[in-house]
Amino acid sequence: MSLVHPDTSNYPFRFAPFLRQEYSFSLDPDRPVCQYYNSKEGASSCPNGTLCPNKHVLPIFQNKIVCKHWLRGLCKKNDQCEYLHEYNLRKMPECVFFTKNGYCTQSPECQYLHIDPTSKVQQCEDYRMGFCPLGTACPCKHVKKIICPKYVTGFCPLGRDCDWEHPPFYVPNELSKIRIKRDDEINTKKLDEEKERRLNAIINGELVI
């Protein structure tokens, strides 16, 4: 048995069945799809219910990208998750670090997709200038620039269907409120804290002078 990678198969836990039933922990991601499961009737259509060792996959959740939380073992939705719970390199989420910086520190071991920026759909220049004659048939991307006044005030009932832009909110700059302390102030505070700790230790009998 290795100290770095010990064999724990002989040490079962009483809560292991609960984790397997509720969160599908320790289940083979390549296990077959249950032939008895009916998406319309739910888990009751399978005689094994939530204890079934096979997958219960809803049709509307197929052909999705891989769940990023499942990759880290943190997804709690089990088979009800709207993302894939399997290793599929073609359906992995896009690497945020690579998209933002143009490179990835985890490459080539990174599990996420590294998409070439030049392969993405380019922004439509006609739409950016104010009008695109092709409309929805345009092969380029139409980026909304007019900010939605309802969204800025707090809520837009149209959501993603709104014709105006919903920009992300930014945290106000707090640099003006930051006060820079001198080294002597920091050292004095540390000295006072040390004296207070020693005094409390003496009072509690933890330190004898």
From Swiss-Prot:
GO terms for molecular function: RNA binding; zinc ion binding. Coiled coil: none annotated. One of its GO terms (cellular component) is cytosol. Belongs to the CPSF4/YTH1 family. This is mRNA 3'-end-processing protein YTH1. A zinc finger (C3H1-type) spans 28-59, 61-88, 89-117, 118-145, 147-169. InterPro entries: CPSF4/Yth1, Znf_CCCH, Znf_CCCH_sf. SUPFAM superfamilies: CCCH zinc finger (SSF90229). It is found in: Nucleus. It comes from the Eukaryota. Component of the cleavage factor I (CF I) involved in pre-mRNA 3'-end processing. Disulfide bonds: none annotated. It comes from Eremothecium gossypii (strain ATCC 10895 / CBS 109.51 / FGSC 9923 / NRRL Y-1056) (Yeast). One of its GO terms (biological process) is mRNA processing.
